[in-house]
């Protein structure tokens, strides 16, 4: 066969197999064609984003998209890939480590992202809290997941163990209050936060005075186990707890001994006499 004939044959083959990205729409592609399309170096951002709107993509197709370096030049593409419900953790989490703060928040809040991936993405975000600005901390406290809000309750800006100045106190108070107002924050997360050794007096006082959280019985019981609750609040919260249960609770409490003793005296004095 001559060189000319070979060249003509190759041209015919190319005509028979044009790039799928040029001849089809993402939703029209048959499952058998998806893998070849995902690997196509000519894959455009718009086509790839439209492709990721398909819920029927296989893990193999998603992994192939993750290997398509041309497609992954796009920030939108990376976010869409990490947010797809079929994207495996070993693909989405490394991608998430490349994201900006609010891109991480967006992925973690996406309803399509699997729960275990959301947790992993939240952990990436939490690991960066020391490096974000005050404005970003406030925004995260208001809008991020409950896990991030709970982390912000504990992640106060300090030097050593002492808050540096009045401005820092005011900033961190705003962050704490914003986190406590976060609609995704749960009772369990608040309890876990106040019981952590890292919980500050400011956090305990903020929760103890909060109009929503301070009314919860389980949170009151948790606050009675902390070392920072004021005597006035401790007396108020202990009044609704039966004496035997209060004894048990205070056994594991870090409250100062003098406050524990007064709570027990008040509880015994208000208890009805035996046999009544």
Q: Model-found features: residue ranges?
A:
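Alpha-helical scaffold segments
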Residues: 2-276
């Amino acid at each position: 066969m001559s060189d000319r004939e070979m060249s003509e044959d190759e041209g015919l083959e190319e005509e028979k197999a044009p790039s799928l990205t040029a001849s089809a729409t993402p939703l029209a592609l048959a499952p058998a064609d998806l893998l070849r399309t995902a690997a196509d170096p000519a894959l455009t951002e718009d086509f790839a984003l439209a492709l990721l709107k398909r819920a029927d993509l296989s893990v193999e197709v998603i992994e192939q998209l993750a290997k398509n370096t041309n497609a992954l030049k796009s920030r939108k593409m990376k976010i869409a890939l990490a947010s797809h419900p079929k994207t495996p953790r070993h693909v989405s989490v490394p991608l998430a480590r490349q994201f900006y703060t609010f891109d991480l928040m967006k992925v973690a809040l996406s309803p399509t992202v699997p729960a275990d991936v959301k947790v992993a993405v939240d952990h990436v975000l939490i690991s960066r809290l020391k490096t974000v600005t005050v404005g970003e901390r406030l925004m995260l406290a208001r809008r991020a997941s409950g896990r991030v809000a709970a982390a912000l309750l504990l992640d106060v800006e300090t030097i050593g163990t002492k808050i540096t100045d009045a401005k820092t106190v005011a900033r961190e108070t705003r962050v704490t209050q914003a986190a406590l107002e976060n609609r995704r924050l749960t009772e369990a997360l608040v309890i876990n936060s106040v019981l952590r050794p890292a919980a500050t007096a400011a956090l305990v006082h903020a929760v103890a005075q909060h109009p929503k959280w301070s009314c919860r019985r389980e949170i009151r019981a948790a606050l009675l186990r902390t070392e920072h609750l004021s005597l006035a609040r401790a007396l108020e919260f202990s009044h609704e707890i039966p004496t035997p249960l209060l004894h048990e609770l205070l056994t594991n409490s870090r409250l100062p001994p003098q406050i524990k003793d007064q709570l027990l005296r008040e509880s015994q004095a208000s208890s009805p006499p035996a046999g009544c």
